[in-house]
Amino acid sequence: MAPVLPAATPDRRLGMLDVLRLLAALSVVAFHFTARHSPGWDGPVPDALAPVGQWTAYGRMGVPLFFVISGFVLLMTAWGRDVPRFVASRVGRLYPAYWVAAAFSILLVLVAWPANPAFLGREITTSDALLNLTMVQGAFGVPDVDGSFWTLWYELRFYLLIVLLMLVGITRRRVLAFCTLWPIAGAIVQGQESRLLSVLLMPDYAPFFAGGMLLYLLHRDGHDLGTWLLVGLQALFALDFSMGYYPAALAEETPWAPSAAAIALGTAACFGLVALVTLTPLAGRSARWMTVAGALTYPLYLVHENLGWFVIHLLRERIGPWGAVLVAVVVALLAATALHHLVERRVSGRLRAATLRMLQPAAGAARGGTPAVAPVPRPAGEPATVSLTAVLPETLVRHSGYGRHRVADPPGAHDAGPRIPAGR
């Protein structure tokens, strides 16, 4: 089977994936500023925003789009890399910007604007705020000091699953089996009320992560029917979740009754857009501005919510709703730019190197010379396609109970430089 793209150099970037990530972040920004009930507006958004807000409400689905991108990028990052380097790259990428953004939000909600958490129904204590600096506050049921932070707990759990897969050894067959069985296993343990496994397996958003991983296999190895059918299966699982969750969530958080058709289309778009920018000639597009777009995505996601709402709260009566929204967007973009240049570019590399120095001796002793990642090439004679019956037992589908969702209260963050690997 011919590869999707010609062999590329390691330095060739997936520029359009960077752009898609920024668009996903901007869709979430638009949802928060122009559609969601918020302390910025002291309730529902003004009527002046309604013509736009009834559409930007679906920007909330930028979060599952982030998760599909996560599945793609994290598998690409982990393949061929050992566990210490993978963990160090994640720590260096996520934490510097997060610590600064979390510290800012702590000062804002505890000192400058306590009406913010009061409006959102959160009681945030000093100890809760400090636990937020770890990024694992969700594991302890502690409120996030910034509403956008909830997605990072999902990301961390996905990283853990990737590490477990790396320890077993990443091969094409194992990734196919993992992506097939993960959402089904999650649905089974959810139906049995197994709290620990349900938290680990994330039944609600697992199909989005798994779908992104499968799209990376298609990008890496080329088109084949079996993998495409598995992508379709993940999309169906994701649609089942979306139709059971987003109508009620959007009706509660916005003044408008959502359209089921729009939610279904948004769910399909999460997979379709990632496929479009990675499996077509668009994947070959690259430019400096695309790199900048990717670099700003994570810091923008981190800082926009509380900061933007605070700006809207201060300016809405003075310059009107649209003026306040425009200023809030500009301020959020400026803050994201500062966070990237002053924190990420100066600290991320140092933290990554320090983490790697700490992890490598322990990993070397535990590994005893055994590589953490299995060889990439398939065995001779192994077909490029995969039989669904080999990885998807019929009884699991029949008895999975998929659809009985108990969803966590609602919305990622990755390397700004996804690259096209050479010699797929």
Tell where the protein language model's regions lie, with residue ranges.
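Transmembrane alpha-helical segments and their boundary/interface "anchor" motifs
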Residues: A24, R60-P64, M76-V111, L131, ...
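Membrane-interface helix-loop-helix regions
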Residues: R36-M61, I69, L94-L160, A185-I188, ...
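Small-polar-interrupted transmembrane alpha-helices in polytopic inner-membrane proteins
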Residues: A25-H32, V175-G191, V231-L236
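Acidic/Ser-Thr/Pro-Gly-rich, low-complexity N-terminal segments
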Residues: M1, R367-R424
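Hydrophobic alpha-helical segments with transmembrane-like composition
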Residues: F66, V73-G80, G92-L94, L131-Q192, ...
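Alpha-helical transmembrane segments in multi-pass integral membrane proteins
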Residues: A2-M16, A30-W55, M76-G80, P84, ...
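Hydrophobic alpha-helical transmembrane segments of polytopic
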Residues: L17-A24, V28, T56, V63, ...
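Membrane-proximal cytoplasmic C-terminal regulatory module of class A 7TM GPCRs
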Residues: R346-P379
